[in-house]
Regions:
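Secondary-structure transition motif
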Residues: 1-105
Length: 105
């Protein structure tokens, strides 16, 4: 698998991928960080989403037509053994699909 630049294309909504982000640190520089995350395009509403967006720290616009909130565009780091996720506040530069799990186990 190869890294894909976010300038070339983005993954589909809510598909878990591996990301590379430039994490800021206290001395003003950045370091590359690799993590799992998913992207949202800012067009999907909470009723279409597979996640529970009942987060007090995410500012969402309400859409009266569909009686749901619009999930903001962005990257969201996900935790695999829980229902938690949080915004990736650093600059994501690249992503790649997750590998397939091992076979025959």
């Amino acid at each position: 698998m190869k890294w894909i630049s976010v300038k070339d294309r983005l993954p589909e909504n809510e598909v878990d991928v591996i990301i590379c982000a430039q994490m800021r640190y206290y001395k003003g520089g950045t370091i590359p960080v690799v993590s799992t995350a998913f992207h949202t395009d800012g067009k999907m509403n909470t009723e279409e989403s597979g996640y529970n967006w009942d987060l007090g720290n995410v500012d969402m616009e309400y859409d009266e037509e569909v009686d749901a909130y619009i999930v903001p565009e962005g990257w969201w780091e996900s935790v695999r053994y829980g229902e938690e996720f949080s915004a990736v506040d650093d600059f994501v530069t690249h992503w790649m699909p997750l590998p397939q799990p091992p076979k025959g186990e």
